[in-house]
Amino acid sequence: MDAMGERKEHRQGSAAALSGRRLADVIKLVPSFFGFAFVRAWDDLAFSRFAALFPDTPWLGQDIVSLGMLPVFLLVVLAARRLAPLYRRPALVIGAPLMMVAAVVFYELSLGLPDGAQAALVLAALLAGAGAALSILQWAELQSCLNSLQIVLYVSGSFFLGSLLGWMALDAGPERMAVIMLLLPVLSLFCLKAAFAKIAQADLPKSDWGAVRFPWKLVIVLGVYEFAMGVTQGGTSFGADAPVLGVLVASAVLFCLAFFFSHRFDFTRIYRTPFVLMVCGLLAAVLSFSASNAVANMLVSTGYALMFLLLTMLLCDISHRYGVSAALLCSIEELVMFSGVGGHLAVQPAVQAAVPPLQDGVVVSISLTVLVVVASMVLLSEREYSRWGASFFGVGSRDPEGDAQAAFVRRCEELAGQHRLSPREKEVFQLIAEGKSPSEIEGELYIASGTLKSHTRRIYQKFNVHSRGELIALLQEKEG
């Protein structure tokens, strides 16, 4: 066998070994997959049930559920330093599934209460929103304990499985639907407990943190996508399955890229180079008013789902690297969903009558296109996501260790930029600087031993050092 054939066989063997390692790692944290998937499925089913109460304006039922989420997200944003981490507070851990179960009970009771049905339904919707919001934030804390590639795998995999389970259960009869919705929160709670039990102590969410930059501009772009989604949902031709299919497509693509191609594909480029998101946004805004409603709705839903998934993964990664509360970061992200409520209202007859230009589909389409273009240009103007937004998380008490960790990460990024390291080399460099062993680095980045040696050799060459000790000494010298 010639040298080229040997290298090819080695690459194939390495890829197979890495896929096996990923599969074993996924199986190790199975509760993370199923637990969050159960919450996503319950969330989709709850939105669907309340939307069905308003056949002419299904978005109204969804907005009432969203209204129940609002106080939870606001409270966490305003009092994160006192509340986080949420998973350590038994009242919140038990309260989330209890509210979800209570929402199902009140919904079922409303069917037999002709006099108080409306009040029971509103209470059920608000409880559903509050319970789901608390549960989502606790799962965000769990996902922030994982490394970057695991975050992509678990977030995308859970969204896919949850949307699939919810979609498959939509046709269940009333009795079966009630049983399913009563079981899902309980199962999710057990999975949450089991998942946190498997997390190493060093990786658990911190109770305090220092200052870190927040990607405000990405959140603004997500808000634009949400508004476009809301405008499309508010139309009479919007397909009920479009959001689910959009999530399935976006999450499946991200999962497959991470699972099968991460050893050859630089996955960090997906959220650092948002050109694809700009294209999705433009197509979503323009084609949502085309003659092909099915295609347009699918583009809108997929574009929004992709943006939401990528931002969720980025925020969990920021939380993992800097120690900032994932509940805080994801609460801010979730608050932008209320721009979708504005989109729903913008296309309603009463609003269109008050604002005549909104009656013209072409005007609305052009306006959305301009919004998406401007937002995408702002996003594309930033080269490093660590520079996005403004530093405001340091207000109030600060954890010296959190500040030290943030400073350490920034120092690594500065040195990596000065020596022109590739994205993968930056990851290897930071893990070496953290004192991780070669086997730990291989496991965290899912790379073969030969690949790690190759990256390490190039890093040494670019820094003009000859050993790990010299590299760490150089980092400490810069620190001093």
Tell me what each language-model feature is.
Residues A132-L146, M307-Y322:
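Intracellular juxtamembrane helix-capping segments at the cytosolic ends
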Residues V39-F50, P71-V72, C191, A195-A197, ...:
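Linker/hinge segments immediately adjacent to helix-turn-helix/homeobox DNA-binding domains
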Residues S397-T456, K462, A473-G480:
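Helix-turn-helix DNA-binding segment
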Residues Q62-L83, V253-L257:
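Central cavity-lining transmembrane alpha-helices of secondary-active solute carriers
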